[in-house]
């Protein structure tokens, strides 16, 4: 019984480690005033989507 628990815990730790290594630091921050892209590799399709993004501007008094 203890062997199964140790094997399961070991497998969980290995999978968690592998998942955390595959993450990138790509951040798309959309606020009311701007759209910021940080740390992203921009290819053709992602670039076309980014060009269409606009700030929310819900609370803006601008006309």
Swiss-Prot record:
TGBp1, TGBp2 and TGBp3 seem to act together for cell-to-cell propagation. TGBp1 is the main movement protein that physically cross the plasmodesma with the viral genome. TGBp2 and TGBp3 would facilitate TGBp1 function. Plays a role in viral cell-to-cell propagation, by facilitating genome transport to neighboring plant cells through plasmosdesmata. May induce the formation of granular vesicles derived from the Endoplasmic reticulum, which align on actin filaments. Keywords: Host endoplasmic reticulum, Host membrane, Membrane, Transmembrane, Transmembrane helix, Transport, Viral movement protein. It comes from the Viruses. Coiled coil: none annotated. This is Movement protein TGBp3. The lineage of its organism: Viruses, Riboviria, Orthornavirae, Kitrinoviricota, Alsuviricetes. InterPro entries: TGBp3 (IPR003411). GO terms for biological process: transport of virus in host, cell to cell. Belongs to the Tymovirales TGBp3 protein family. Its main location: host cell. It comes from Potato virus M (strain Russian). The keyword Transmembrane applies. The chain crosses the membrane at residues 1-21. It is found in: Host endoplasmic reticulum membrane. GO terms for cellular component: host cell endoplasmic reticulum membrane; membrane. Residues 22-63 are cytoplasmic.
């Amino acid at each position: 019984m203890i062997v199964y628990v140790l094997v399961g815990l070991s497998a969980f730790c290995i999978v968690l480690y592998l998942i955390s290594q595959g993450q990138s630091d790509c951040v798309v921050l959309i606020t009311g005033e701007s759209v910021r892209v940080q740390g992203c590799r921009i290819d053709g399709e992602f670039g076309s989507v980014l060009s269409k993004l606009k700030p929310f501007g819900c609370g803006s008094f601008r006309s």
